[in-house]
Regions:
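Juxta-kinase regulatory segment immediately upstream of eukaryotic protein kinase catalytic domains
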Residues: 1-25
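ATP-binding glycine-rich phosphate-binding loop
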Residues: 18-41
Length: 148
């Protein structure tokens, strides 16, 4: 897990500046390789994700494009929130930062799911793979680089 480069005060100010969203509270989410913070507002919740330095904006733009592609095909994926300037990301201390709508749910540790949870996960993975077969740009990228 990556530590945030924001203080709590800075994060609230930047969210107001970049997204025009008033933050009520912040909650750290301790999972994944990025720094993830749940953003609680009056109307809905979001996550703010700060990526490791090794992920440049081109990498993040690829991810955003794929997620938006899947969303248009009714796959349950997080919705990216655009900044006031229309971009889906910004930089803070050399890190790429994005905001997504928060999705209620649960996370299962590796090898700890029930039979039904594994079947449900496999179903969604199959749907994602099926739709990505129609994503033309995918074949022009070196996917192996994503996992190094």
């Amino acid at each position: 897990m990556l530590e945030s480069m924001f203080t709590e005060k800075e994060m609230k100010e930047v969210i107001k500046e970049k997204y025009n969203i008033e933050v009520i509270d912040l909650e750290k989410i301790n999972r994944g390789s990025a720094s993830i913070t749940k953003i609680i507002t009056k109307d809905k919740n979001y996550i703010l994700k700060e990526f490791q330095d090794k992920y440049d904006k081109e990498f993040i733009i690829k991810e955003i494009n794929i997620i938006n592609f899947l969303k248009k095909r009714n796959i349950k994926v997080p919705k990216y929130i655009s900044c006031k300037n229309g971009k889906y990301y910004f930089f803070h201390n050399r890190r790429v930062v994005i905001m997504q709508e928060f999705i209620e749910g649960y996370t299962i540790n590796n090898n700890n799911g029930t039979h039904n949870q594994i079947i449900e996960s496999a179903k969604y993975l199959g749907l994602i793979i099926k739709e990505l077969e129609n994503y033309e740009k995918l074949y022009s990228w070196n996917i192996n680089e994503w996992f190094n």
